[in-house]
Amino acid sequence: DYDMQDVLDDYLNYCYTDGLIPVSDAWKYMRMQLAGTTFDFNISSSVYYDNAERGFRAHDILGLYKNKSVRAIGKVIARITAVETENGVKYNTEFGELTDERKEVIAKAMDDGDSHGYDLRTIEHRYFFVEKFDETDFKKVTPRAPMGTRIFDLTQILGSNDIPSTDQLAEMLKNETWT
């Protein structure tokens, strides 16, 4: 089941990257990421990072999972890859704007990664910047943590095509659960 989901996610990433799916429906998707160790850094810096080789489905909302629940959500406003080279850090802006402030956050993420044994320096990572993370409690009601990324169609969860602001969405998700 998880292997098939990975194959489907990779295929969707390929389709979006190569323009085979011309209209993005990212507005209705939330990507949930496991963030136990780095959760506090993610919240305080309004960023989440992941290995750049990992594909992903287009999404506007990013959720951070910790302790059996999505604990925070944020609207993605920039997506930037970065890796250290002998000539300094090489950045690639996929979406949004590369600012000096975002470069500083990436440098701090690399330092934070070092403290947890993660190699964010020599392995290219993708940085998802959000406006801010809003606290929520979108509980997983089945045993065991998820095996990795999970995509949620917010229109199905909310029963509406109207996706509210991130702070309102965070409040609404507190009344929902998932398996």
Which functions belong to the PLM regions below?
Residues 1-136, 143-152, 156-179:
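Charged, terminal alpha-helix-loop-beta segments
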